[in-house]
A protein has these predicted regions:
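Phosphate-coordinating loops and pocket residues in cytosolic domains that bind phosphorylated ligands
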Residues: 11, 64, 88, 125, ...
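Hinge/capping helix and adjacent helix->loop/strand transition within the periplasmic-binding protein
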Residues: 37, 64-70, 77, 84-166, ...
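An extracytoplasmic/periplasmic, membrane-proximal ligand-sensing/linker region
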Residues: 11-13, 154-160, 238-297
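Structural signal for conserved beta-strand scaffold positions within catalytic alpha/beta enzyme cores
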Residues: 49, 74, 98-101, 138, ...
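N-terminal (or domain-start) structured segment
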Residues: 4-95, 132-133, 141, 145, ...
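Residue-level signal for the nucleotide or nucleotide-sugar donor/cofactor binding architecture
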Residues: 118, 170, 210, 235-240, ...
């Protein structure tokens, strides 16, 4: 029996690769999950940041690793479900086994606190009445905020001009200076910047923001969220996957984990391995259609 016990997974530290810099949202969430799971697994979990090529470098480090459960990854949605429809990347969804989904944070349509609009309908009415007069910000052509805004305005029948920025901070600065009027980001930005939310880009309201209406309530079905799975290279043994899934689920149920997520204005959105894969595939298909529609000139 002792030989079997010695081989029991995990018997050495586990690495979680994050394809973005330390201190960013993905990194913080991965570290929280690593803390919680290491307690459940009674084993060290280390987060390794492998940055480059908009996430491709880190994700390739996961797909290139042995599928033994000792190399995992946490990534936001774009590199998995958006970038592959825009350019060649060295992986597909079939390159991974999904341990589970950590969270789903819908994007929010945001304007300056001083903006004249208090509802999405107010804003869209003005934008439709004055085509190409207003500007929306994005964190670059091809980013999730870019497609979210493009899709929203297309579905609402409004013509709004686009100004790309290098990231959230620059975009919100431009909103404060009224150089652009609208942007979309996740709930954390509501506290961080001088903005108000007009609508949640989802079909149902956020439990942390019960007073924020959804885009669906305005009749515009443009749904976008930032979501993160815990993934592994394809071919994870079933028992290893079960052990990891179990540890993940238990870690995410701990009050400490939930509280730490709430501090980032995020809510746990756990899905098990099977449901996570179905969710990611569905998002990918939807994004492919939107991208095709918007890229077709």
């Amino acid at each position: 029996g002792s030989a079997v016990a010695a081989d029991a997974f995990p018997n050495r530290p586990i690495t979680i690769v994050v394809p973005f810099a330390a201190g960013g949202e993905t990194d913080l969430v991965a570290r929280m999950l690593a803390d919680g799971m290491s307690k459940e697994l009674k084993q060290v979990m280390v987060v390794q940041n492998i940055v480059g090529a908009s996430g491709v470098a880190g994700i390739s480090a996961v797909t290139g690793a042995k599928p033994d459960g000792y190399t995992l990854g946490v990534t936001p949605s774009a590199p998995l479900a958006m970038h592959p429809h825009m350019r060649k990347v060295p992986y597909t969804l079939d390159s991974f086994d999904f341990v589970g989904r950590i969270l789903k944070a819908p994007y929010i349509v945001m304007v300056a606190k001083t903006a004249p609009w208090n509802t999405l309908d107010d804003m869209l009415r003005d934008m439709k009445a004055n085509p190409n007069t207003f500007f929306f910000a994005s964190s670059g052509v091809g980013s999730v905020p870019y497609f979210a805004m493009m899709d929203l305005f297309k579905k609402a029948g409004a013509q709004v001009r686009h100004v790309p920025f290098s990231g959230d901070a620059d975009a919100f600065q431009a909103i404060a200076g009224n150089r652009v009027q609208v942007y979309t980001s996740t709930a954390g930005s509501l506290d961080q910047y001088d903005v108000k939310g007009l609508a949640l880009m989802d079909a149902t309201r956020d439990p942390l923001l019960p007073n924020l209406p959804t885009v669906k309530e305005s009749g515009v079905e443009a749904y976008y969220s930032q979501w993160m799975p815990l993934l592994a290279p394809k071919g994870l043994p079933a028992d290893v996957k079960a052990t990891l899934s179990d540890a993940m689920r238990k870690a995410m149920q701990s009050p400490e984990f939930v509280e730490r997520l709430h501090k980032l204005n995020l809510v746990p959105g756990y899905l098990d391995s099977k449901d996570c894969r179905a969710f990611v595939e569905e998002e990918s298909v939807r994004n492919a259609e939107v991208i095709k529609g918007l890229m077709a000139k």
